[in-house]
């Protein structure tokens, strides 16, 4: 995997959502005194850990990036994806919530709420149907066994070798 492709995907998507826009909000609205540095830092660190783990899995297992123009070519159902279907979004939302708590900013809390609502709508209505088209029955089986948002306590061991995309965008039979 080309390191530049990976870095570009990280900087453009989660970097924009979790760093550039919150920094702009703080710049224009002012910084309140940090009310809860420990709690805010905890959420930020959990979010960063999830983002790093999921990006690494997309590269090493999925042979792609989080960017829509270079998505994983294999369905990723290892690591944190054995517990929950959307750990990358969970990581980004943890970072946004942590920033709101850390800075004591209602504007950043509103930005977190916007991101949460957007993903609660987008994931089931757009992303999941697209993944069903790309990976077929394997993704349907994954959806039935791994929750969208609340992690399972035990890892799901259902797919030993997940689907890989054909050139025309359908899973291998």
Question: How would you name each of these model-derived features?
Answer:
Residues 86:
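Extended, alpha-helix-rich binding/interface surfaces that flank or overlap catalytic cores
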């Amino acid at each position: 995997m080309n390191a530049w492709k990976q870095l570009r995907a990280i900087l453009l998507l989660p970097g924009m959502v979790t760093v550039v826009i919150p920094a702009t909000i703080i710049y224009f609205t002012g910084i309140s005194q940090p009310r809860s540095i420990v709690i805010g830092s905890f959420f930020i660190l959990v979010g960063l850990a999830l983002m790093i783990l999921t990006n690494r899995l997309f590269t090493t297992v999925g042979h792609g990036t989080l960017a829509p123009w270079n998505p994983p070519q294999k369905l990723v159902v290892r690591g944190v994806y054995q517990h929950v279907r959307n750990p990358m979004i969970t990581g980004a939302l943890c970072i946004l919530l942590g920033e709101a708590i850390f800075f004591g900013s209602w504007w950043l809390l509103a930005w977190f709420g916007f991101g949460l609502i957007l993903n609660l709508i987008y994931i089931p209505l757009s992303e999941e149907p697209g993944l069903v088209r790309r990976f077929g029955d394997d993704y349907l089986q994954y959806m039935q066994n791994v929750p969208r948002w609340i992690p399972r306590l035990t890892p799901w061991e259902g797919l030993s070798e997940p689907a890989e995309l054909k050139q025309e965008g359908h899973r291998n039979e």
